[in-house]
Amino acid sequence: KFVVEGEEEVGSGHFDDYVAHHADDLAADVCVWEGGSKNEQEHFTVTGGVKGILAFDLSVRTADVDLHSSLGAYVDNAAWRLIDALHSLRTPERRLAVDGYYDLVEPMSAGTRAAVDRMDFDAGGLRERAGLRQPFLRDDPKLASVSEPSLTVNGFESGYTGDGVKTVIPREAHAKLDCRLAQGQTPQACFDLIRAQLDRNGFSDVEMTFQLGEDPFRSNLDDPYF
C-alpha cells in the first residue's frame, strides 16, 4: 500500500481526516515513511522519530503612533519591550527559562540512546557548510539534535528598516517563533507554559498567537520491524 501526501510543508491539514475515513484500507502492521535522504557520508538515512513543532507569533504595542526618538529617555519602545520579553524566556546557558517546560520531556531509553551513539553525525561539516560564526550551544550537538527542545526566533519586525535614517520610537513590534518539541511534549501544553511564563515575567501585554502545532513521534527501536 502506498500513500502520497502533498501538504506536509503546510501542516498536513487534511491528513488526519483522510486516515480516519480510510482506516480499513490503510490498516497495516507497520508504516514506512520513505524520504530518500542521504547524510553527509552519502548514506541513506533511517529515521526513528521526529521532533514536534509549535509555531506562534508574539506582538506588543506601546503607543497608538510612532514617536520621535527625542522622547526615548522616558517613553518606552515596542522593539525593546519585545526584546526584553524574548530575553526573559532564555537562560544564560541558552536554554528555555520556562517553568515546567523540561519536566514534560520523556527520558530516552537505553536502546534509543545506543542508536543515537551509532548515528553518523558530522557537526564539523555543518559548521563549515553553513559558515557558523558562533560555538555550538551544546557540547554534544548530536544528542541535542534528537532529544533537546529548542526555541527559535524566525523573524523580528519593528520600526523603520529602510535606507538612511528615521529617528522614531516604534509603536509596535512583532516576532515569529517556533519550538521544536522533544518526546513527551505537546504543542498546546508548551504554548500554555510559555504564555504563563511571560505573564509571570511581567509581559502580560505581549500578545501570543498560536499558528501551528504537531506532536513529536519516536519509533520503538526495539521493535522487530525496526
Where are these regions (language model features)?
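Acidic/histidine-rich catalytic neighborhood of metal-dependent amide-processing enzymes
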Residues: K1-G49
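Metal-dependent amide/peptide-bond hydrolase catalytic core
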Residues: K38-Q41, A55-F226
